[in-house]
Curated annotation (Swiss-Prot):
Residues 1-23, 88-96, 164-192, 300-312 are extracellular. It comes from Macaca mulatta (Rhesus macaque). The lineage of its organism: Eukaryota, Metazoa, Chordata, Craniata, Vertebrata. One of its GO terms (molecular function) is arrestin family protein binding. GO terms for biological process: adenylate cyclase-activating adrenergic receptor signaling pathway; adenylate cyclase-activating dopamine receptor signaling pathway; G protein-coupled dopamine receptor signaling pathway; G protein-coupled receptor signaling pathway, coupled to cyclic nucleotide second messenger; phospholipase C-activating dopamine receptor signaling pathway; positive regulation of MAPK cascade; positive regulation of release of sequestered calcium ion into cytosol; vasodilation. The keyword Endoplasmic reticulum applies. Interacts with DNAJC14 via its C-terminus. Interacts with DRD2. Interacts with DORIP1. Belongs to the G-protein coupled receptor 1 family. This is D(1A) dopamine receptor. PANTHER family: ADRENERGIC RECEPTOR-RELATED G-PROTEIN COUPLED RECEPTOR (PTHR24248), D(1A) DOPAMINE RECEPTOR (PTHR24248:SF139).
Length: 446
């Protein structure tokens, strides 16, 4: 306040200059955010349109629906608000109600698509055989249709019928508020009923479902990783016990410590992966929805706790929209999409090498699993097959694979008939785990 008063005393010229500088910085930042959201989600949509093998994967339907909702946020929501932020008023007149409906619809659709993706991944990893039979393109379209229908119902109908607005305390206040909103303001106050009900449907129920599904995914992955480690230790132990010296006497057997370390690292990677997924989503949207439920209970001019000014509230609104720029990185940056992006952008030489070390985890009918590795050539696009992503953004490193090989960790189940195959990309920090289809003889297709 002291700085503001001093600048005002220095003359209006300095105030205008500082205000102009703030507007320029705001315009640059918001433009970068909008462009990054447009670029990321446009690349996802273009990759699926361009490459048939991406369209053949049912789980990619949900990723595309998410990309479309985030793309609509960048086209129908963010630019109009950015212009209003820079101009200092709402210059689009009666378009306000339509914009508010678009805002609620697109943001809700993005969040519900994230929820559907978490449920899809949980079904795929918890009941893989049933998932392969039940999760058809028709079933995927039904889930996507439910998410979008709910988003439309919660947005356009209440907004067009003015159910979302708070009732004015007096007729004079109502006329003044309507006139202000029509001329230069589109920040209409929500009614308490609509603010709470829409927040519950748009955020609190989906985030609760996501917490449950990703927690269960971590527990399943933890059990499988420990089972793998136990089998690897047993295989190494048996191999060491069968080794003999020159005089025919067996060598003393020892349990390898490297297997315990690798098991712990794998569990840590899964935990970090799921923490990134939930952490980014919650950090972006939770502050807004908390304030969205509190502000309707704040009277005009009140200075109660959490009754913040409009500028602070707008900052948290942009935090929520920023989630749309991060979703392509988290959910559509696996090996298949990265290769498609490299092809679309024509940057095989400039982009990071795609000669990735791939570790395959095969799980048989008894729930046992094994790891094996292979390499994919630079610039190659995987053949068309039905794959299902389980956990996005699995974090890995090629050094772990080298350490396992140097430690002599065996692959105990290589000869078994695997039922499922889960691929972890070890060359990058972002990848998706997948399930390969099963042939009639119970083997993976070659």
């Amino acid at each position: 306040m002291r700085t503001l008063n001093t600048s005002a005393m220095d003359g209006t010229g300095l105030v205008v200059e500082r205000d102009f500088s703030v507007r320029i910085l705001t315009a640059c930042f918001l433009s970068l955010l909008i462009l990054s959201t447009l670029l990321g989600n446009t690349l996802v949509c273009a990759a699926v349109i361009r490459f048939r093998h991406l369209r053949s994967k049912v789980t990619n339907f949900f990723v595309i629906s998410l990309a479309v909702s985030d793309l609509l946020v960048a086209v129908l929501v963010m630019p109009w608000k950015a212009v209003a932020e820079i101009a200092g008023f709402w210059p689009f007149g009666s378009f306000c109600n339509i914009w508010v409906a678009f805002d609620i619809m697109c943001s809700t659709a993005s969040i519900l698509n994230l929820c559907v993706i978490s449920v899809d991944r949980y079904w795929a990893i918890s009941s893989p055989f049933r998932y392969e039979r039940k999760m058809t393109p028709k079933a995927a379209f039904i889930l996507i249709s439910v998410a979008w229908t709910l988003s439309v119902l919660i947005s356009f109908i209440p907004v067009q019928l003015s159910w979302h607005k708070a009732k004015p305390t007096s007729p004079s206040d109502g006329n003044a508020t309507s006139l202000a909103e029509t001329i230069d303001n589109c920040d209409s106050s929500l009614s308490r009923t609509y603010a709470i009900s829409s927040s519950v449907i748009s955020f609190y129920i989906p985030v609760a479902i996501m917490i449950v599904t990703y927690t269960r995914i971590y527990r399943i992955a933890q059990k499988q990783i420990r089972r793998i480690a136990a089998l690897e230790r047993a295989a190494v132990h048996a191999k060491n016990c069968q080794t003999t010296t020159g005089n025919g006497k067996p060598v003393e057997c020892s349990q390898p410590e490297s297997s315990f370390k690798m098991s712990f690292k794998r569990e840590t990677k899964v935990l970090k992966t799921l923490s990134v997924i939930m952490g980014v989503f919650v950090c972006c949207w939770l502050p807004f929805f908390i304030l969205n439920c509190i502000l309707p209970f704040c009277g005009s001019g009140e200075t109660q706790p959490f009754c913040i000014d409009s500028i602070t509230f707008d900052v948290f609104v942009w935090f929520g929209w920023a989630n749309s720029s991060l979703n392509p990185i988290i959910y559509a940056f696996n090996a298949d999409f990265r290769k498609a992006f490299s092809t679309l952008l024509g940057c095989y030489r400039l982009c990071p090498a795609t000669n990735n070390a791939i570790e395959t985890v095969s799980i048989n009918n008894n729930g046992a699993a094994m790891f094996s590795s292979h390499h994919e050539p630079r610039g190659s696009i995987s053949k068309e097959c039905n794959l299902v992503y389980l956990i996005p953004h699995a974090v890995g490193s090629s050094e772990d694979l080298k350490k396992e090989e140097a430690a002599g960790i065996a692959r105990p189940l290589e000869k078994l008939s695997p039922a499922l195959s889960v691929i972890l990309d070890y060359d990058t920090d972002v990848s998706l785990e997948k399930i390969q289809p099963i042939t009639q003889n119970g083997q993976h297709p070659t």
